[in-house]
Amino acid sequence: MDKHFFSKINLDIISDTKELYIGYSGGPDSTALLHYLNSNLDIKLTAVHINHGISDRSKNWEKHCSDFCKQNKINIICESIKIEKNKSIESEARRLRIETFKNIVPTSAHLVLAHHLGDRVETLLYRLFRGTGIKGLSTFSDQAKLGTLKIIRPFIKIEKSEILNYLNEYNLSLIHI
């Protein structure tokens, strides 16, 4: 594996806690993150899988995540959310995920998300095309606070292609949506 990949991962931002909760969809980004943290940190990890229930395959995805965590000896919490039909699916799903994370993650722990460099660029372009002001053009950083919830993004300088290479290197199974 390319040493440059590992040098871009900022684990220093994780040093002030003994427990991490990882947002885990089972997709490529969160699978690579969960595997990487489990392989490189001696810290209690808990994966959090949120079942949106918007696909016929949602239960299969949840089972895949549970099985992956069991095989890798990682704690997992699976939560189901219900998105109201008259609301925007994307914004309502985001709101409910944040609410779920706030309810699950204790204040002594941190939430770790697998946002990567491509997500950062995508967010910037989305905000730019929406006509946001200068302040709105700043994208997310490697650390954030949402009330008492501390969010960590150690992959923020990693490109998607590097994540895919990591998955191939370790032959990790994931969900293809």
For the regions a protein language model found, what residue spans apply to each?
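Core alpha/beta nucleotide-donor-binding catalytic domains of modification enzymes
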Residues: 1-174
